[in-house]
Design a protein with these regions (language model features):
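One-carbon transfer enzymes
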Residues: 1-210
């Protein structure tokens, strides 16, 4: 059984989607070991407690980043987390944090990376006038929205869209993408070739093409 650690700063809709997928058997051989927020008023923490999950608040305000990260890592390890999922966690992890969980930290971003990294990605995409947007689940590394891409889902930008309607449709795909990515990573049947995330069944073909 794999133990997931969830980090969030807000309502945690992707956390809820992960929890629902576990309960429904769509995520295999996994449980949520702990939910951690850096904000005491995060609605996601209330939701976690209502679901009977271990839920911790480790405030970040006024603390150096690495000091806070060490407290979070200690809590994750105490609860046996072997995969960390960021679900609207509005903190940039320190290199030290990332090194504690190599290829074991996932993030979801509401754009087709590498396009539109950072905050308000949906608004960036809409303002730029792209015809297709979407979401990306990727490994977390030392740079912002940069790690190897695991899963992407596309969403057409309709002529009738506004920023809100586009964001809602992207969020629906986020929930599907995170479940898919977690299953792939927990299965362990993958390799990273350069920057490419490749399922192991495809490795021979990739090596032949190089």
């Amino acid at each position: 059984m794999h133990n997931l650690g969830i980090l969030l700063s807000g309502r945690g809709s992707n956390f809820v989607a992960i929890a629902d997928s576990i309960d429904a058997g769509r995520i295999f051989d996994a449980r949520i070991a702990v939910v951690i927020s850096n904000k005491s008023d995060a609605p996601g923490i209330v939701t976690a407690r209502q679901r009977g999950l271990n839920a911790l608040v480790i405030p970040s305000k006024g603390k150096p980043r690495e000091e806070h990260d060490r407290q979070v890592v200690a809590a994750l390890k105490q609860h046996g987390a072997d995969l960390v999922c960021l679900a609207g966690y509005m903190r940039l992890l320190s290199p030290w944090f990332v090194q504690q969980f190599p290829r074991k930290i996932l993030n979801i971003h509401p754009s087709l990376l590498p396009a539109f990294p950072g905050l308000e990605a949906q608004e960036q995409a809409f303002a730029y006038g792209v015809k297709v947007s979407g979401c990306t689940v990727h490994f977390v590394d030392e740079e912002l929205d940069h790690g190897a891409i695991i899963v992407q889902k596309t969403v057409p930008v309709l002529d009738t869209d506004n920023e809100r309607s586009l964001a809602v449709r992207i969020l629906e795909q986020e929930h599907l993408a995170y479940t898919e990515a977690i299953n792939i990573v927990l299965g362990g049947d993958f390799a990273i070739v350069g920057r490419r995330f490749v399922k192991s069944s495809q490795n021979a073909e990739v090596k032949t093409q190089k």
